[in-house]
Amino acid sequence: MPGLLGKKIGMTSVFSADGKNVPCTVIEAGPCVVTQVKTVEKDGYAAVQLGFQDKKEKHTTKPLMGHFKRAGVTPKRHLAEFKEFETELNLGDTITVEMFNDATFVDVVGTSKGKGFQGVVKRHGFGGVGQATHGQHNRARKPGSIGACSYPAKVFKGMRMGGQLGGDRVTVQNLQVLKVIADHNLLLIKGSIPGCKGSIVIIEK
């Protein structure tokens, strides 16, 4: 589906038409430049590769420099492919946040905040005896048994244990578009999206 690359600026809130305070996320969406056009005849599928944010030539590998020169654009820091664009695009074309003027809902793909190695309480919601907050023992926050002994003599896959939390690719669907500020390439989306401030996200129609 068509979309854009963007950068998460942060969260704020706006007032709706009926006076309610609505939390929203501000995204700097684009402008993105077409760096490659893939066709069914040549590549086996139709898609458009977009580049976002300039970077210095000295920080770009030679193969990528050749890729950008063929497109006639400056080196880009982030690249992503999108399919099913309604209009025919050519190398070097610029796509702005105005493509979301007619969009009511979008999907956002981002990388969730990395939390490092976490236990079962934070990672899986273990802990406690019911909703007790006082009087419970620390052992109530432990994972408990992870399997039998001589049979099956192993830990089954999917057993909920401590481990790395966050840092995953996350897609949030059907987020409402509250406002498009084309002059500043800003997109206001209702609610939160994955990632920290300054992280790169993909917005799809």
Swiss-Prot record:
Molecular-function annotations in GO: rRNA binding; structural constituent of ribosome
InterPro entries the record matches: Ribosomal_uL3, Ribosomal_uL3_bac/org-type, Ribosomal_uL3_CS, Transl_B-barrel_sf
Subunit (UniProt): Part of the 50S ribosomal subunit. Forms a cluster with proteins L14 and L19.
Xref: Gene3D superfamilies: 3.30.160.810, Translation factors
GO cellular component: cytosolic large ribosomal subunit
One Pfam family of this chain: Ribosomal_L3
GO biological process assignments: translation
Family label: Belongs to the universal ribosomal protein uL3 family.
Protein name: Large ribosomal subunit protein uL3
This protein's UniProt keywords: Ribonucleoprotein, Ribosomal protein, RNA-binding, rRNA-binding
Function: One of the primary rRNA binding proteins, it binds directly near the 3'-end of the 23S rRNA, where it nucleates assembly of the 50S subunit.
